[in-house]
Amino acid sequence: MLAGFTPFPAERAQAYRAAGYWRDQLLDSVLRTAARTWPDHIAVIDADHRHTYAELDRLADRAAAGIAGLGIRPGDRVLVQLPNTAEFAVALFGLLRAGAVPVMCLPGHRLAELTHFAEVSSAVALVVADTAGGFDH
């Protein structure tokens, strides 16, 4: 367990599982299953990209290989500051497949917030868009 992590109360977790809200399935396995079940269905779409589940699955594998190639190891924390785009989905699943722990940051966060998140999480890297919302990173 991560230091400082507070789990859901056991009773609520049990109720969520009983209701089917939680299926004790890793997020990455949900994408793998969807890619096998509905390979040609659209998984994610934004203004510039449209990926099927099979495409997103392949892109996530490529991203994971690239992330590992950069020296990111399983358990490493990585700040993710991306807008709501297809690129976010690729990065998130790539990080999960590489075994990294994504630390989500809002696109509006700036140096002070990112520095704080990096310090408290011991993040080793940052995934950021070149530009987002008119801000040049």
Language-model segments: residues:
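Short proline/glycine- and basic residue-enriched helix-capping loop/turn segments at helix->loop/beta transitions
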Residues: 36
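Helix N-terminus capping/helix-initiation residues
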Residues: 9, 20, 81, 134-137
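Structural core segment of the AMP-binding/adenylate-forming
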Residues: 69-70, 93, 97, 101-137
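Generic anion/oxyanion-binding catalytic loop in active/binding sites
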Residues: 16-19, 45, 49, 103-106
